[in-house]
Amino acid sequence: MCGIFGYCNFLIEKTRGEIIDTLIEGLQALEYKEYDSSGISIQGDELKSLNIYKQTGKISSLKEEIDLYNLNKNLPFISHCGITHTRRATHGGLRRANCHPHNSDPSNEFVVVHNGVITNFANLKALLVAKGYVFKSDTDTECIPKLYKHIYDTSIELGYNLDFHVLTNLVLKELEGSYGLLCTSSHFPDEVVAARKGSPLVIGVKGKTDMDVNFVEVEYLDQEEDYLKLNTQTKSSGNVLAAAPVKYNTCLRKSPPPSFTIPEKLYNFYIQSWLIHRNASRERLAATHGILFVIRLCITSAVCE
């Protein structure tokens, strides 16, 4: 069992030291006796750069690893997104290369932390290796950031300018198995994408002023009505991986987007498992076709963390 944690501050100045401390505290809250490594990704000194630090052993070993780099912990960030991970070795043994976060390439264009199992990772890895990607680990997770980069680069070549949310949907469409994941990217600074399939996620928002929050509720239908099919097509071959289009019977209905105001205190948003396992028929749908749930929290005219 792995643990993932992310922290974002928007329009609230925090020093790098404060950000690292918050991320480490989040990791410590996820500590349990069987984890064997941990890692962290934060913004670098240069704009749109991401740094990764990871180490086997306890979280104290990760803190020692970070200290070796003599980072400027007084460097301020008006906005910043950082992600962290504790790992128990499953795919791949206990070695530093297998620790999370995993990256898409040496420049860390896409960085991912992940809890779950990608069951088709061998096929994805073979495809990506054929495209020239070099894998450093034995994990199933590493295929995710490299898939992000492959789809992103391909979309640019095809003339598409995808936002982070649309790009994530294209990536998730290719993944089989279960996941709770966080992804950051140098192409989308000050943004983080959270997605889950079978693994609950919790989002907490804290601000000094009231905030308007909008979100979209989704319900998976047994019949095809007022739905958005999950196999979104592109103008080229229908799939940026040039594979045959996949047909899903799973249907998605969007309810009217509710909105509400968050008072001046911490609120937690629980993405519960009941959405997937409400009854046996939906359980079969989840097992057969998979259910995607991408979290997108839109905060209007607010400063928050």
UniProtKB/Swiss-Prot annotation:
Gene3D superfamilies: Glutamine Phosphoribosylpyrophosphate, subunit 1, domain 1. Keywords: Aminotransferase, Glutamine amidotransferase, Transferase. This is Putative glutamine--fructose-6-phosphate aminotransferase [isomerizing]. It catalyses: D-fructose 6-phosphate + L-glutamine = D-glucosamine 6-phosphate + L-glutamate. Pathway: Nucleotide-sugar biosynthesis; UDP-N-acetyl-alpha-D-glucosamine biosynthesis; alpha-D-glucosamine 6-phosphate from D-fructose 6-phosphate: step 1/1. The active site is at C2. The lineage of its organism: Eukaryota, Fungi, Dikarya, Ascomycota, Saccharomycotina. It holds the Pfam family GATase_6. It comes from Saccharomyces cerevisiae (strain Lalvin EC1118 / Prise de mousse).
